[in-house]
Amino acid sequence: MLFSSPEARSLLANRQRRTPCVLLLDTSWSMEGEKIRRLNAGLRTFREDILRNPMAAQSVELCVISFGPVTVQSEFALVRELAPLQLEADGVTPLRQALELAMLKVTERKHTYREHGISYYRPWIFLLTDGEPTDDDGVFSSSYRQLLQPLQLAAAEKKFTLFTIGIDVSAQGRKVLNALSAPFGGRCLDLANLKFEEMFLWLSGSLSRVSQSAPGEAVQLVNPRVGDDLYDGWVL
């Protein structure tokens, strides 16, 4: 039956327009120690902040994917329905494979919304990494270039919006992230001093703003300040 699964029943019970977001999080070995601890703390802060906003709590849906190795930590669900996560650092940085999976999850979720008559805002993919894309041996891989044309098409057709965040990345890593976000009119934002909680507060505030906007309305996002870097001009 169409509404036999818990997911279907949840969609039937709550007809609120959805604000879907994929958190695409680097958990490779280089995130060990303080970085992964701050990332987990930031995720807790994000969850708490979304739940403080009644409208966002009914609208914002998260899918969490970690990479190193690529793992779906949680499928799309309202934030209150997600179990708290405790991520661990391990493995290399298969960024291309992780981003491909995120794009697939967005496509599948939009299909589910349409199947159940749920309206939705343009999905977000929020990519956060501290390194460069690698192959299985941990060597730099340029295979991310295979995604540039699909990303350009996705941006032109407004299929989703991609934001890229670099955690003290190298010049080469920043070049990769800039290339990935360029089709969406953005660039890599540098996350200085491991300010994960501030970054996730910006994200929750921005998603909350989107969830309260009118269909078709251009949403001017809050300009995040991370370290000394003010990233302005994000418009959805």
What kind of region is each of these model predictions?
Residues 1-22, 28-37, 51, 110-121:
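Acidic, polar low-complexity linker/tail segments
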Residues 50-57, 107-118, 151-157:
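Alpha-helix termini
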Residues 83-121, 161-175, 197-202:
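Von Willebrand factor
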Residues 25-28, 39, 64, 102, ...:
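DG-centered beta-turn motif at the end of beta-strands
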Residues 58-86, 174-180:
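Short beta-strand-loop
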Residues 161-225, 235:
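Von Willebrand factor A/integrin I-like adhesion domains
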Residues 131-183:
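VWA/integrin I-like adhesion module and closely mimicked acidic/polar interface patches used
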